[in-house]
Regions:
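Glycine-rich (often Gly-Gly/Gly-Pro-rich) flexible segments and glycine-rich loop motifs
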Residues: 165-167
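Juxtacatalytic substrate-recognition/specificity segment
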Residues: 23-156, 162
Length: 178
């Protein structure tokens, strides 16, 4: 009887703990369900966007083409095929590279305090450089670990790299491209 009670309590604890869990590590999930999602593809990348943001997606493709030749300068492994997801229904301006699953997400509302280059081009250069950085983490011990735990190994590799180096390198790249 005591074992059954302990098993029931452990099961209840496990169920209560999962209340806050979700399938993704990070999700901006603010897009209306009425969006019809489209995509534009090239050999190197894919832009996923709602049908209402076709103009933003076209500009993003243009900027990706503009920065592609220089984006992996200084790294052994070049950029890789990765989807770029546009989220236009927001009031923030930011970008995010996620590795689980691999993608680059853009909150496409322009920043109020713009710089010398078009805001979207700056964001594309910055976040695309982060994607190249993550791709270069996947070698040596981390690559071996990826055969055991999958894409999460690159995330573990991020713990070995200082944040100031990652951000500084991305800012330097976007500055060099301005």
């Amino acid at each position: 009887m005591k074992r059954h009670l302990i098993a029931i309590l452990l099961t209840l604890c496990a169920l209560i703990c999962t209340e806050r869990l979700s399938a993704q590590y990070y999700s901006w999930g603010v897009d209306p369900t009425s969006f019809r999602w489209k995509q534009m593809k090239t050999k190197e990348y894919r832009v996923v966007y709602p049908d209402t943001a076709r103009g933003v997606a076209m500009r993003m493709m243009h900027y990706l083409d503009a920065v592609e030749s220089d984006i992996s300068y200084g790294y052994r492994h070049p950029q890789m095929s990765i989807p770029f997801v546009v989220h236009p229904a927001n009031f923030r301006s930011n970008g995010l590279v996620m590795w689980l699953p691999k993608r680059v997400e853009f909150l496409s509302t322009p920043d109020v305090n713009s710089y010398s280059m078009p805001w979207l081009k700056q964001l594309v250069a910055h976040e695309y450089r982060h994607a190249v950085q993550y791709n270069n983490l996947n070698r040596g011990f981390i690559k071996g670990l990826s055969y055991v735990i999958g894409q999460q190994s690159s995330t573990i590799g991020l713990l070995l790299m200082p944040l100031w180096m990652m951000e500084g390198d991305a800012v330097m790249t976007e500055t060099a491209m301005s």
